[in-house]
Amino acid sequence: MISLFHGLFLSLILFILGLTSLIVRRNILFMLISLEIMMNAAALALVVSGSYWKQSDGQIMYILAITLAASEASIALALLLQLYRRQRTLNINALSEMSG
């Protein structure tokens, strides 16, 4: 069984990896992937904490977090598809410039 420290440390590393990628990347699709990594890191922390205290609440919250992440990802991908069809780019810097 994995210890609480190691599980939370892995979750922290994944969260920092996602946050760093979110800050560094300029492509909206990669930013969405970074957000998904961060959400999965938080869900991992819930499962590890629930397992440590022998409570099933962490696993129930994990199921909730995964369903929320799936719905968020599907809506975001639909919006990204429409954005790409209109602008022909997913670069956040090109999209933030005003066209007139």
From Swiss-Prot:
- A Gene Ontology term for the protein's cellular component: NADH dehydrogenase complex
Q: Name one GO molecular function term.
A: NADH:ubiquinone reductase (non-electrogenic) activity
Per the record's keyword annotation, is GTP-binding included, yes or no?
Answer: no
What enzyme category does the UniProt record give? translocase
Decide whether keyword Transmembrane helix is in the record: yes
Provide the E.C. number(s) assigned to this enzyme. 7.1.1.-
Report keywords, A-Z.
Cell membrane, Membrane, NAD, Quinone, Translocase, Transmembrane, Transmembrane helix, Transport, Ubiquinone
Tell me which family the UniProt entry assigns to this protein: Belongs to the complex I subunit 4L family.
UniProt-recorded name of the protein: NADH-quinone oxidoreductase subunit K
Tell me what organism the protein belongs to.
Buchnera aphidicola subsp. Schizaphis graminum (strain Sg)
Q: What is the lineage of its organism?
A: Bacteria, Pseudomonadati, Pseudomonadota, Gammaproteobacteria, Enterobacterales
Q: Which gene encodes it?
A: nuoK
